[in-house]
């Protein structure tokens, strides 16, 4: 990504990444559609009642893996291949540690987590079985996300998509087999999702071993190195925490919504599935912008960093406007993919949420790109703070207004968080670019003086 038209390169990189994100969300959407249509609205509520804690835990895993890929992209752009390989190995060790710790903790604390979320009694058992299986599958989630992050860091976003596509097809059949044939209910949906995730991760590993000589580790690369661990943690942990901090606000939001009853839990679950699916293009272009800027930082090309930010925001805002219009006018129709026509109250509430969200969807085009570029330039702490502002905004709306305005307050919690975070991260991103530009100019001046 250090040569050629920035917009063209970013779109080429983002497209397979987008398809991969869509397929990853398809896992969840297929689960929800089959559960909602076959098992009913309460079963759908069971699957969705813990979505915020899944976002917190799995978001931390995915964010950490994405962060671990940033130094890899930087050293790949700087053509320091041996150092890049050192970081790949040390990142893998950190991922293994995270997988063991999170799987053990989350599985043991699952009942307490559901109590904190105020899960209604009539859906508790199904929610518990679904969430526990998802937690037990954390190692597979980390396996796929770390390997796909490494492949993307060296410019290959196509391969992870291909393997994810294959596993997505399998996920459909596993869903139907586990739920319809084996009668495993909500637990069957979780088993199908985790199995598909495991297959995509294993396929990525086989591809790297057989085809990606660039990523093969030599004996000297397979040692734990303090400087590598330190830099990886400095990038990965803040990025993971960024997702988790945002998720804490979502947990407060979901807990407040759960108290409104199973009808609104079903409506919220339905709206969240649609939201997560339509957010995939934002995530794809933001990740593309981050990798683009990180590689060009390593290559010392500050002008291309600025162009990368402009291109990313332009594409993101443009998509946000189009998607927002769709949510405003087609929310009710989209909700019917998950809930039958007879669940009128659920459909109306879901459509209301999507309609309110649609008016502010454009802001995500700025927020996600600016945050990921800030992270890609190495200022992960500042990117994390944008997540803190989101958490605070959601918490204030839910704790301060749900008691008075009910579900209407829930409908405006996300938008308040997005606007608040954007007001912080966009000027911060511009500051980070200016600082990076000065740093690169200083390095170039020292090199010229030395020569």
Locate predicted features.
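N-terminal transmembrane alpha-helices
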Residues: 2-39, 52-67, 71, 96-103, ...
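Transmembrane helical elements of multi-pass membrane transporters/channels
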Residues: 12-31, 133, 167, 196-200, ...
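Small-residue-rich hydrophobic transmembrane alpha-helices
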Residues: 44-104, 141-160, 267-331, 364-386
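Short runs within selected transmembrane alpha-helices of multi-pass transporters and secretion channels
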Residues: 65, 134-152, 160-168, 189-202, ...
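Short alpha-helical transmembrane segments in multi-pass integral membrane proteins
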Residues: 1-14, 72-137, 181-237, 293-360, ...
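Transmembrane alpha-helix boundary and packing residues in multipass membrane permease domains
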Residues: 17, 21, 33, 70, ...
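Helix-terminus/linker motif at the lipid-water interface of multi-pass membrane proteins
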Residues: 26-45, 114-121, 177-186, 244-273, ...
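Residue-level hotspots within pore-lining transmembrane alpha-helices
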Residues: 19, 23, 27, 57, ...
